[in-house]
Amino acid sequence: MLGSWRAFSEMFCHLRPWRRFCLRKVLPPWLHYSRALSGAEAINALRPFYFAVHPDFFGQHPREREVNENSLKRLSVYLENLQKPGFKSLKPTQLTFYIREKTAQNSSEGQEPVSTTGFRAVRFTLHSSDLLSTVLYILNSCSLPVEHVQSLNTNVHSQPLKEATGMPDRPIKWHRSYYSFTGFKDPDEDLEHVSRVETTLTSWLGSNGKGAVKKLKNSLPLRKELDRLKNELSELLQLSDIRWQRGWGVAHRCSQLHSLSRLAQQNLEPLQNAKGCTIVFTDRSGMSALGHVMLGTMDVHHHWTRLFESLPNYFDLQRRMSALEDQISHLLGGIQVVYIEELQPALTLDEYYSLLDTFYNQLQRSRAPPRPQSLSGLQMILSRYAPSLHELGHFNIPALSDPASLQSFMRTKAQQARENMRRREKLKVIENELIQASTRKFSLEKLYKEPSISSRQMVDCCKRLLEQSLPYLHGMHLCVSHFYSVMQDGDLCIPWNWKKGEAMK
């Protein structure tokens, strides 16, 4: 029996190089070295995927809609766990999605042929502990483009991606006949093509401007309805704000507000507990680390009602969390513990409190003498990675770290941190001025940016925009992102580092 098993394993050992090639195929050459991806950047990078599988587009196909809803929930949990500080390992997660397609394509490994209904099933298993590798694996599994992810890997210290994938240092080169026979794309040929023909802002707006205007005009009645519903609910429940975690379309947002409005008509009393709060429509219900009330878009009214009824308990936990932050601040010389939504994983209040409690207990056990107000005015966030000073001026501190060396590191970098914070404030003022100037010059209805776009990137983008003459932008909604896209409601997305002039020949 043992001999049979050995023979069986030897039979397939020659496939190991093929596995390494598959990893190379999934990860483009420009990502051989890359940095850690933030949660906001991951969501942004996966936008083409979310658009292809969103349940709203499967209204006439309830079975496929349900499959996508359940898979999106599991994917959301996987991605959030991947970003949590101190995580050790994740169980492999098998997911099935139905992908919308306009035209039929040949089936490939792991995919079923396109059905007559205009979608196909895709199955894949997530097992990577690296967020960037996971994002690329999802996009490639669904035959979606990955080129827009390249711009997410600039201006940051790189780390070898091979650690997450087990890839060899030496890239595997295949003869052109291999690509001709298999039908795979030659990455070197694609790279050469991109270098020859590069999209410019003017050419892209010229090709997509009219279509965006049409979509925007069609969405105007729903946009007015959205504003009306938002104002009515904010006034009725005395809310601070209503927001959305993801880039859902206007119709989807209206549907969510109608649902909340019906719940308020049926049972107003529990909802009044949210007075003064910000409501965020997201993937799961609860309270966020920032204290926002999260309404899961896949949950039914019963779940929402239970959440509103339990808000007093959450408010109590908020008070305990604030006290815990003050205690940590005292032990670390007056530094302020903050949660920055754009730079940290999406944590619930319970998860964030548990993280703070773990960090506090570690400080307590070290018995390191507190240094009163030596770090007053500075900020820190809890993260997964080694201690570092962010360009915005805050410290990134791992939840599990040696308190003595931690304090020494922060004292050494304190002066640099203060200088970074002063630069950040000046940069923010410049950014706001440039946004206003750009909005006026191009008569934009709205100019905004993705959460993953830094102030420095936004400033660079707006400065260059102000040097251009772009009549296509009149009356439009313009979003500064990492790639070109026309959203379903007519918003124009452009990369912050857009190219000007004629396309390169």
UniProtKB/Swiss-Prot annotation:
Q: Which InterPro entries does its entry note?
A: DUF4460 (IPR028031), DUF4461 (IPR027989), TCAIM (IPR027986)
Its ancestry begins with: Eukaryota, Metazoa, Chordata, Craniata, Vertebrata
Q: Which organism is it from?
A: Rattus norvegicus (Rat)
Pfam families recorded for this chain?
A: DUF4460, DUF4461
Main localization is mitochondrion
- Is the keyword Coiled coil assigned to this protein? yes
Task performed by this protein: May regulate T-cell apoptosis.
The name under which this protein is listed is T-cell activation inhibitor, mitochondrial
Induction conditions = Up-regulated during induction and maintenance of graft acceptance and down-regulated during graft rejection.
Give the UniProt entry's GO cellular component terms.
mitochondrion
Q: In which tissues is it expressed?
A: Expressed in peripheral blood leukocytes, mainly in T-lymphocytes.
Q: What gene name is given for the protein in this entry?
A: Tcaim
